[in-house]
Amino acid sequence: MANASICTIGDEILIGQIVDTNSSHISQALEEIGVKVTRMTSFGDDHDEIVCNLTNELTHNEIVITTGGLGPTKDDITKAALAEISGSKGYVVNESQLKMVHEILHARGLDVLDINKAQALVPDTCEVIVNHLGTAPIMVFRFPKERY
């Protein structure tokens, strides 16, 4: 049985502005497929804190799932922290997610701003699963077991 950690990221979670309901749903889904959740944790929008905490979680679990920290705001720096941890050399535009950003915002009658387009910029070290429900992509990083 694989072990997993669920990490919620965002100052809004820590100050109680948003309630973390994602972890419960994710934990139940993982349990159904035989993955044991060993830890759920939350931390704020601080680059060094994200890097430190995620690196620690990677040393103890085969799977680390993060939620939050990817909104179209300037203070969401989770993507940069993940790029650093994964050894990314830069960002690439994921055209499929960019198309989805346009579709979602146009369906809501909103203009697509540069900050929205930036959601489709992903570290070159990840695979992307297109998010059909929101503008932030689902990024999958694979780390060699011996690395952590």
Regions found by a protein language model. Give the residues of each.
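Well-ordered alpha-helical segments embedded in enzymatic catalytic cores
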Residues: H25, E49-N53
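Glycine-rich phosphate/diphosphate-binding loop of Rossmann-like nucleotide-binding domains
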Residues: M1-T41
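Short glycine-rich anion-binding loops that position phosphate/pyrophosphate groups of nucleotides
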Residues: D11-E12, G69-P72
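Proline/glycine-rich low-complexity loops and linkers
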Residues: E49, I77-Y148
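Short beta->alpha junction loops
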Residues: R39-E49
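An anion/phosphate-binding loop that grips the pyrophosphate of nucleotide cofactors and donors
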Residues: N61
